[in-house]
Amino acid sequence: MKLNVSFPATGCQKLFEVVDEHKLRIFYEKRMGAEVEADLLGDEWKGYVLRVAGGNDKQGFPMKQGVLTNSRVRLLMSKGHSCYRPRRDGERKRKSVRGCIVDANLSVLALVIVRKGEQEIPGLTDGNVPRRLGPKRASKIRKLFNLSKEDDVRRYVVKALLPAKEGKENAKPRYKAPKIQRLVTPVVLQRRRHRLALKKKRLAKRKSAEADYAKLLAQRKKESKVRRQEEIKRRRSASMRDSKSSNQSAPQK
């Protein structure tokens, strides 16, 4: 079995091939996330504590956290599940994954050093691999360099040195810097003020339209009420005329 060991403190990662099955027994029946003392792997591992991060079996199927078995299962997966990347929106697919319990059928086991031991391991703990990219967000750059709100963040951007082109080795070195996100500049403040002004303008326009509509509605109701009263008055007068004419035309006894 191969052990893919990483050390987050230095950023290094190294692959070890262990032939002796007796040394690997310390990992058997352990779940993903379990911490194991690695003293039995050899003298150079004395004092080291490793965390089981995952692995693949001999057919290449990955271990999945939460599947409490040491065999292979087929699960219906959707967006957000580990070991699966949807190709279309809302797509679900049944995929074969391995359980989160370690056994002898794994080909590669991923481990993370939680506690460093007494000795250095060549290629893993003695070197240091710097991060290729620095932070991109303005607040994270401030946090990294302990800056205040008044400091200019643009001066502290971590730039990457670009390799020189062929035939231009003596030219001025070129750097590549990320575009800072969430950076507050005068243009950003101007856009914010413009958006607020548009919002206030829309609000005033809506209130004016509502007032005009309420005024028109009240006027229409008043006109309708006047027309209804006039109609009632006209009908009443017409009925009174009809009753008078009928009384006059009736024969006297």
Swiss-Prot record:
Q: Name one GO molecular function term.
A: structural constituent of ribosome
Tell me the domain of life: Eukaryota
Ribonucleoprotein among keywords: yes
Pfam families given for it?
Ribosomal_S6e
Q: Which stretches are tagged as biased composition: Basic and acidic residues?
A: 226-244
* Ranges where the record places region Disordered: 209-253
Keyword annotations for this protein? Phosphoprotein, Ribonucleoprotein, Ribosomal protein
Quote the InterPro entries the UniProt record gives: Ribosomal_eS6, Ribosomal_eS6-like, Ribosomal_eS6_CS
Any single GO BP term: translation
Listed GO CC annotations: ribonucleoprotein complex; ribosome
Query: What post-translational events are described?
Result: Ribosomal protein S6 is the major substrate of protein kinases in eukaryote ribosomes.
- What function does the entry list? Component of the 40S small ribosomal subunit. Plays an important role in controlling cell growth and proliferation through the selective translation of particular classes of mRNA.
PANTHER family to which the protein is assigned, alphabetical: 40S RIBOSOMAL PROTEIN S6 (PTHR11502)
Sequence similarity? Belongs to the eukaryotic ribosomal protein eS6 family.
Identification of the protein by name: Small ribosomal subunit protein eS6
Source organism of the structure: Manduca sexta
